[in-house]
Structure formats: C-alpha cells, structure tokens
UniProtKB/Swiss-Prot annotation:
Subcellular location: Cell membrane
Cellular component terms (Gene Ontology): plasma membrane
Organism: Bacillus subtilis (strain 168)
Annotated GO biological process: carbohydrate catabolic process
Membrane topology note: Single-pass membrane protein
Domain of life of the organism encoding this protein: Bacteria
InterPro entries per record: CwlT-like_lysozyme (IPR047194), Lysozyme-like_dom_sf (IPR023346)
Keywords: Cell membrane, Membrane, Transmembrane, Transmembrane helix
Listed name of the protein: Uncharacterized membrane protein YocA
TM region positions: 12-32
SUPFAM superfamilies: Lysozyme-like
Amino acid sequence: MKKKRKGCFAAAGFMMIFVFVIASFLLVLLFFNRDLIKKLPIDTKTIVLERLTDYKPLVEEELESQGLSNYTSLILGMMYQESKGKGNDPMQSSESLGLKRNEITDPQLSVKQGIKQFTLMYKTGKEKGVDLDTIIQSYNMGAGYIDFVAEHGGTHTEELAKQYSEQQVKKNPDLYTCGGNAKNFRYPYCYGDYTYAEKVKEKTKTVEESLQVATLETMESKAHE
C-alpha cells in the first residue's frame, strides 16, 4: 500500500514539474515574441495599443490619399472601439461593402474600406454642416444620422442618437432587439450604439497619449545615439 502511495506521489510530482516547465517555456516564448502575444485574445491596454500602432503606417497612408492626414489618432480610436485591433476586420467595415459582419478576411482591406467609409461620412457631414461628433457617430449609425442631425440643429448629442435609433427600431422592430436582452444598456434604442461617439473620443485620447509617449521615447533614443 505504501509503495502505491509513493508511486502516486511520484507521478503527481512529475506531472507538476512537467506542467511548470511547459508553462515557463510558454511564458518565455511570449515574452520574446510580441507578435505572438498580439494575436492572442489578451486585451490589456498596452497590448491593444501595440496592435493599433502596427496599423498606423497604413492608416496614415490611406488618410493622406483622402486628404485627411489629421485624423490618424481618430481612426485608430475608432479601430480601438470596433475591434481593439484584433481579427481580420479591425475596422468592422464588412457591412459598408454590402457583406455580412466580419466577412472581410484581409485586415488591410478592412482598414482601407473603413477609411473610405469614414471619408464618405466626413464629406457628407461637411456638406450638411454637422459637427465632427455627428460624423463619428455616423460611422456606427450610417449616413442617415447625418441627415437627422442636420435637421435638428447640426450638433450631435446622445439624446439625438437615441431618437434616431428609436426611429430605425420602429421601422424594423424584429431586427433591432438588442439580442432580446432588456438589460442591454442600449435597450430600447437597439439600432447602433448611441454612446459610440463618446467612446471613440475617449479611446482617441488614449491613442494620442500613447503616440506622444512613443514619439518622445524615439527622440530620446536618437539623442543618445
């Protein structure tokens, strides 16, 4: 009986050591492979910002081609809100191409289409005389929201977003149900997210602060070379 117990303890001890070694190996691998970490479903602020920063050159290039170079941080803030930089459709722009959600499988296409859609909303918004918050909100609610705000003073508010959402829900109540969850914060305004513009602005501020720190670190590094 004692021999059996010793055998069980030995097996358990070996298993614990094996698990510890494997776990340690994975931790070391992750520590030295930042690209691998960014692909994992880990959403710490630092990792999310690293994902977004990877898209910065492409975002800058696409915005420059549209004459909107000043909006890099905003687009990255929108990406932060849409997907945290994860997946093949980081700008969640599939639907603006007439596709189903997440049907875009090329992240670069997602970014290009997302910026194309933002540019369209931006130009439409400027023509209609609405504020930037309305343009941001329209990325979530569509161009119809720009028309709606233009008819109600030209300045976005969450109350106007709720009113517009309510209108759209009445047109198709079986579709916009918040997943049937009455406890969803959007309920009963289940078309879009009436808080979208505010969330994007908060995340844009976070992105701007991160980019400023990165710029200062780069400058200091060059100064010490």
